[in-house]
Amino acid sequence: MNKPVAIITGASRGVGKAVAIMLAEKGWNLTLTCSSSLKEAEKVAKECNDLGAETLVLVSDVSNDLKCRETVDATIEKWNKLDTLINNAGRTVFNAHENMSGLTTEDFVEIYKTNTVGPYMMIKESEKYLRKSPIASVAVSYTHLTLPTTEY
């Protein structure tokens, strides 16, 4: 069976985990990425495998161009296609609005690289494969959240 394939960044917990399980229930194969919580991502992969999905788990950092390329390349190497990209990886620093000094320039840059540049790079690396899919879709979930922080 030629199952559809999705990459889900930030798939080790929360929205990413929920999307992974939902797609596995619907018969998708999945590349699941995490930046550091490999054990949690592997647990999500096992849940998806138990639902019939094939999975590929990668430690990746969407703020790193090379890691974005490697994620897409590994997905294509495994399944020779890509149908959906779920940009869910996100980063923040919880800081009260009235405390601007609580957020460093380095914090801001890292947040921006992950939450804005990361989805762009994943889309850029995925585009040529997504254009070949009759069901292609791209979603960016993290940027839709409203968080009580000062970085935006």
Feature map (PLM): residue ranges:
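Conserved NAD(P)H cofactor-binding loop of Rossmann-fold oxidoreductase domains
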Residues: 88-96
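Single conserved hydrophobic/aromatic residue that forms the stacking wall/gate
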Residues: 144-152
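The beta1-alpha1 cofactor-binding region of Rossmann-like NAD(H)/NADP(H)-dependent oxidoreductases
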Residues: 38, 59-71, 105
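Substrate-binding pocket helix/loop in short-chain dehydrogenase/reductase
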Residues: 96-100, 104-109
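Conserved glycine-rich Rossmann-like NAD(P)H-binding loop of the short-chain dehydrogenase/reductase
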Residues: 26-43
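Active-site loop of short-chain dehydrogenase/reductase
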Residues: 3-4, 53-54, 81-82, 130-142
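Conserved glycine-rich cofactor-binding loop
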Residues: 12-14
